[in-house]
């Protein structure tokens, strides 16, 4: 068993935890009672941090919702306020890789908007068009991506049928990519509160999985997040390909 490390200063504790990971002494990093800013500062340190050059830091969560027929992944509810096109592409790659760790060979990724219409008034809907074109050209491999779609159409077949929307995602989404942090975070908290959903989440991008629980997360949610991190470590070949070959 490893010897406990007792450090009172939050910044120093975060730096030491990051150092241990960098030197191979740990496979997973988890935030405890220190502030998120303290940990992120250590993770993002350009010289001694955990984020490889050129990678983005984002958040991916997964929920088991009693009224949905399978696990539902979504991003980003915690880190990137308004993703750029390239950031959205990276978010999708992280989600695809994580889905594979969960045994989902052909993830269905829905690009979420308040409507199914593309409009220059909503620049992210134009990004969605580009992403769908990349997916159709095989850029993401064995994955189905469509959008813009609203949450209901992405997760309920009847909604798409009523609207007359023809999409390979209708009612079958594995992943929801939200347009901004406001919509993602509102979804995250609404579903966990009103639908009694079990949840797990990790930071994506660093060289190891990072469990970043919210202050209001339950013990069970933290447990599930650790389990999700263990799956990601076990699927390190996919993670290494994601970080090093792209």
Model-derived features: where do they sit?
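Anion-binding alpha/beta catalytic cores of soluble intermediary-metabolism enzymes, centered on
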Residues: 1-169, 174-246
